[in-house]
């Protein structure tokens, strides 16, 4: 897991990590804006086969907002203008807490123009830089939790746990409007969790750079840590070999108590992770995504690092 610093794109962080870890393949599981910092899961080598498992998971952010001002980008990197009079009083703690509760649950959110979403093959931010606004479809999001951490005048910090695809920049502006200040923009943003991964598990680029090649490998998470919610089974040598060769196997599954069409993490009898299979019949398992064991370095080229 990578703790991406502010001021660098996720893709730049990805490329640095890929170089330092001498990985042939690499990909991240969800972009962080350049201004944002925090958890960026990066998958390396064979782990890229399983990166999609993190794309739809919930995420948690700590966001700092400035009320009464808006930005064309939704954050401190854009053109900022005041939208409320200087004679307006700041909110109190109870007022903000009450408004935050109204955002809980399901709602629709229109993605911002300054985003990487594509329209006709072109990222929205490119239209925005050309002064063009295009129609965007609203997307359903879920705010699971939102709490006020600090409040000082028109500046506040909140913690938000939300569904994948939620734009915290848009949420910040909507909170500012709901409080009666015409909007708000982000002055800072940190992602502190992605699914079951926490920022406390992450390393930063300076640490990665300072370590020896051997110690860098020790910072990586094992590939199967991406698949914590998927049940596992143990195979004997013959079963493992046949699945790795792309063949289906018959196996007595009665002791596992799992329904048909269940995805399965596959391990050999030495507890080596082999990949994902699926139970397509009460006693039939087929391979779905198997790893090439000779390409896995210390089993950890599943390392997760969050960057754009």
From Swiss-Prot:
<dbReference type="GO" id="GO:1990481">
    <property type="term" value="P:mRNA pseudouridine synthesis"/>
</dbReference>
<dbReference type="GO" id="GO:0031119">
    <property type="term" value="P:tRNA pseudouridine synthesis"/>
</dbReference>
<dbReference type="InterPro" id="IPR014780">
    <property type="entry name" value="tRNA_psdUridine_synth_TruB"/>
</dbReference>
<protein>
    <recommendedName>
        <fullName>tRNA pseudouridine synthase B</fullName>
        <ecNumber>5.4.99.25</ecNumber>
    </recommendedName>
</protein>
<dbReference type="GO" id="GO:0160148">
    <property type="term" value="F:tRNA pseudouridine(55) synthase activity"/>
</dbReference>
<dbReference type="InterPro" id="IPR015240">
    <property type="entry name" value="tRNA_sdUridine_synth_fam1_C"/>
</dbReference>
<comment type="function">
    <text>Responsible for synthesis of pseudouridine from uracil-55 in the psi GC loop of transfer RNAs.</text>
</comment>
<dbReference type="InterPro" id="IPR015947">
    <property type="entry name" value="PUA-like_sf"/>
</dbReference>
<dbReference type="Pfam" id="PF01509">
    <property type="entry name" value="TruB_N"/>
</dbReference>
<dbReference type="InterPro" id="IPR036974">
    <property type="entry name" value="PUA_sf"/>
</dbReference>
<feature type="active site" description="Nucleophile">
    <location>
        <position position="33"/>
    </location>
</feature>
<dbReference type="InterPro" id="IPR032819">
    <property type="entry name" value="TruB_C"/>
</dbReference>
<dbReference type="Pfam" id="PF16198">
    <property type="entry name" value="TruB_C_2"/>
</dbReference>
<dbReference type="InterPro" id="IPR002501">
    <property type="entry name" value="PsdUridine_synth_N"/>
</dbReference>
<comment type="similarity">
    <text>Belongs to the pseudouridine synthase TruB family. Type 1 subfamily.</text>
</comment>
<keyword id="KW-0413">Isomerase</keyword>
<dbReference type="GO" id="GO:0003723">
    <property type="term" value="F:RNA binding"/>
</dbReference>
<dbReference type="Pfam" id="PF09157">
    <property type="entry name" value="TruB-C_2"/>
</dbReference>
<keyword id="KW-0819">tRNA processing</keyword>
<dbReference type="InterPro" id="IPR020103">
    <property type="entry name" value="PsdUridine_synth_cat_dom_sf"/>
</dbReference>
């Amino acid at each position: 897991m990578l703790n991406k610093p502010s001021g660098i794109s996720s893709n730049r962080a990805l490329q640095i990590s890929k170089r330092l870890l001498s990985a042939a393949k690499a990909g991240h599981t969800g972009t962080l804006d350049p201004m944002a910092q925090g958890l960026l899961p990066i998958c390396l080598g064979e782990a890229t086969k399983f990166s999609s498992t993190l794309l739809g998971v919930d995420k948690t952010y700590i966001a700092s907002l400035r009320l009464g001002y808006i930005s064309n980008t939704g954050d401190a990197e854009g053109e900022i203008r005041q939208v409320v009079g200087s004679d307006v009083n700041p909110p109190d703690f109870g007022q903000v807490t009450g408004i935050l509760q109204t955002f809980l649950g399901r709602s629709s959110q229109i993605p911002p123009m300054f985003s990487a979403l594509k329209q006709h093959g072109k990222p929205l931010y490119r239209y925005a830089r050309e002064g063009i606004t295009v129609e965007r479809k609203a997307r359903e999001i879920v705010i699971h939790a939102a709490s006020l951490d600090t409040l000082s005048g028109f500046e506040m910090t909140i913690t938000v746990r939300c569904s994948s695809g939620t734009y915290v920049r848009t949420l910040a502006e909507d909170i500012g409007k709901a409080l009666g200040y015409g909007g708000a923009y982000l002055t800072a943003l940190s992602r502190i969790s992605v699914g079951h991964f926490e920022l406390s598990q992450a390393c930063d680029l300076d640490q990665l750079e300072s370590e020896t090649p051997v110690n860098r490998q020790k910072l990586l998470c094992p590939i199967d840590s991406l698949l914590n919610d998927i049940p596992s089974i143990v195979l004997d040598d013959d079963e493992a070999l046949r699945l790795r060769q792309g063949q289906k196997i018959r196996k007595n599954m009665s002791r596992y108590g799992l329904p048909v069409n269940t995805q399965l993490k596959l391990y050999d009898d030495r507890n080596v992770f082999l990949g994902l299979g699926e139970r397509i019949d009460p006693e039939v398992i087929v391979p779905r995504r198997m790893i090439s064991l000779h390409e896995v370095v210390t089993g950890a080229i599943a390392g997760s690092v969050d960057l754009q």
